[in-house]
Curated annotation (Swiss-Prot):
Official protein name in the record: CASP-like protein 2A1
Claim: Cell membrane is one of the keywords in the record: yes
The keyword Nucleus is assigned to this record: no
Chain ranges on the Extracellular side, renumbered to this chain: 60-80, 131-163
Gene Ontology cellular component annotations, sorted alphabetically: plasma membrane
Subunit structure: Homodimer and heterodimers.
Amino acid sequence: MSKMAEEKVLAAPATVDGGMQSSGDLQASSAAAARVRPVETLLRAAPLGLCVAAMAIMLRNSVTNEYGTVSYSDLGGFKYLVYANGLCAAYSLASAFYIAVPRPATLSRSWVVFLLDQVFTYLILAAGAASAELLYLAYNGDKEVTWSEACGVFGGFCRQARTSVAITFASVACYILLSLISSYRLFSAYDPPQPSLGNKGVEIAAFPR
């Protein structure tokens, strides 16, 4: 190998097998993560208050009148909403503390945060969607199965449930943003796919006239 070729090899940036970035790129990513850490910590703490508020409103949602008594515990979708908000509140607190403490950026930690963000995002989204469907039936009924609307009789119950569901969807928005942040942090640690080294052109057969 010539001297010039050796210099080119030494000057080329080292990459990790599997398409990961070099150590210098990882250090740059760590510096960028340190700059956005306070913002991400606040964003992770925000769902804590939202989830607790949605859970507390739904837990107190019970109405009694001359037509009877209705409580959130009578409906499986609303019970799921309470459980999901409780779990997401605990995760928000834990993840906010985890992000607030400076740690070396590693690929395994990025994968863990990414996967947990995905799990809890879909968990709270499913709870909000199921509860929204219950609210729709409570307000409009379902003529095909002869279900009458119930909010005309239990209006206070429906209003509290609607408030809890609206707050839950605000938490969903926060978790979607967190999922985008964690996915960007994870996949930016990998190099983009390299173009194929095969033939770039397409040969077209020429037929004689």
